[in-house]
Amino acid sequence: MKMRYQTITMVLLLALVPGLAMADNALMEALGGKAAQKAMQDLGFEKGDANVLVLTDAGHAIVDGQTSQAAIKGITNESGNSIGDGNLFRPLRAHWKPLWFYFFDKSTGEAVYLEANSEALSKSLDEFLDLPDDQVFSKISKANVDIEYLQNHTDEGNVTFNDKAFNGNEFGLVAMSNVWARGASYDFLQATAFHDHLCPGVTSGLHIAEFVEEKLPITNSSESYKVISCPNWCKEDLFQMRWDATPGKSGMFVMALTDAEKKAVPNVAGIYIRWNDTAKEGDALVLAYNFSAVDLPKWTGPSWGSKIYQDIVLMPYENNPEAFITILKEFKVDAATLANMQNAGMHPLKVAGVM
């Protein structure tokens, strides 16, 4: 009899789980909708406005055990922004980070940042729908983030960055907004979102990827790129997204260099291999990347704008990556050489013969 009651109880609990999940999803969807409505009100745009970008960590953040992906549906329903239209991106964040929403209008340069109040998400759906915006969101900020505007209004930029108007997310959100407004490609922005922000290091990864793809194009299904990252910097996150060259699938091996080693091979940026897994052989390039190779326009304002401005002036070089890149060595790779470059205790630059 006791076992029977336990079984009935378990069945009832299992029956309740889908309903609880649906309730959580409805609440998150309503949250995304409220964020979009508030942004539309504050920025003065209508549904489907192609000038508007949305950035959010919805889908990454988990709030009191609730996943947050349904908030994206709420945004799309209200503002029309979507992943498919290339005007909604989800910068990567750890699941315990706050859930936030950011809307940017490139026609005005203005942006609104909203951070969810976790206490509001503990309400019933009916209670939640009745809450005013200042109880749904723990932080609501508005600022003009266009870099040209900020260059002429550094006092406003000082407030935005120094007072953390976007709760510490200022650099990444402002940089992504500005390159999106200037026509950055979808795949580049996807890689930027994976890195969780845009910086010149990610842009250098795009340049290197374009260069390698030109010199060592993939020609059949047996081929893939392998990366020996020595030294590593932000560029590696772009390779993982663009080439599926991840450490977990042995597509990337990351190693640091000492200051002395960096001096021995100036500007070295790693070893890039087109590997044929059927033939067990490949072609390799040891590359150098020199950020100072081109005399780019310089930012003259406060430090918060320097890398954002550099991101923008680097954009035209996507089609001219060789302006920054030098081939240090080209060589053939067999299985033994590849293993030596990948294995602990072996220095890949010494194996490649450049150190």
Model regions and ranges:
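Short alpha-helix boundary/capping motifs
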Residues: 1-2, 14
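Non-transmembrane, aqueous-exposed alpha-helical and coiled segments at domain scale
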Residues: 23-198, 207-355
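Bacterial N-terminal signal peptides that target proteins for export
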Residues: 2-9
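Basic/polar N-terminal segments that are highly enriched at the extreme N-terminus
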Residues: 1, 20-24
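Bacterial N-terminal signal peptides
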Residues: 10-17
